[in-house]
Amino acid sequence: LDRRDWRVNANANQDYSLGGLILNTSGKVVANYWLDEVFHPDAGRAHREGDLHIHDLDMLSGYCAGWSLRQLLAEGFGGVPGTISSTPPRHLSSACGQIVNFLGTLQNEWAGAQAFSSFDTYLAPFVRLDSLTYEQVEQTLQEFVFNLNVPSRWGTQTPFTNLTFDWVCPADLRDQYPFIGGEPVDFTYGDLQEEMDLINRAFIAVIGAGDADGRPFTFPIPTYNITADFDWDSPN
């Protein structure tokens, strides 16, 4: 409570709160289980004596995970016992909402980052189908980023999220037809470079602006695929 233990400040994503107190307290029980029952006694002793440090002992779970955004958008978010289920999204706003719900839910089962790849490629069809303007895309992505930065995971933490952007449609997807709302559309992912550009430009604008106080967003952490056909001269 008086924050004298160094471990209170070990996680920059966790603030002083009731949720943080609960996580820190229960985490010590879990950490002792790891050291006594899972790791070799020599490893447990080495950690306790400061010879080495084993990270994230507070969580009896895997570390990081990557998921299929294409599968989520094709099937909708569901299958989690005791929670609501969604049909496949038909619009950019509902797609972003399901991504937030998915990442927030799965984050509670993992210690580290949750990631989606090809974010711009897989969301571009929604921009095309609804003929969205740049302003509409930017507004939707602003809501998306703000929602991802709500402290909704255990310990009053923000979900640790990572998104990979292709910038240019990958060769293995260029001739494939998206399924939106469970139905195929009459264009391929390779036809959507203009829509991908809108998404990338809007996302960078939102991340660059920060929140209402100008504070930078912690998440999602963006990763860009730098391939041989990367457009270095893009206006974005």
Regions found by a protein language model. Name each.
Residues 1-236:
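Conserved catalytic cores of very large enzyme subunits
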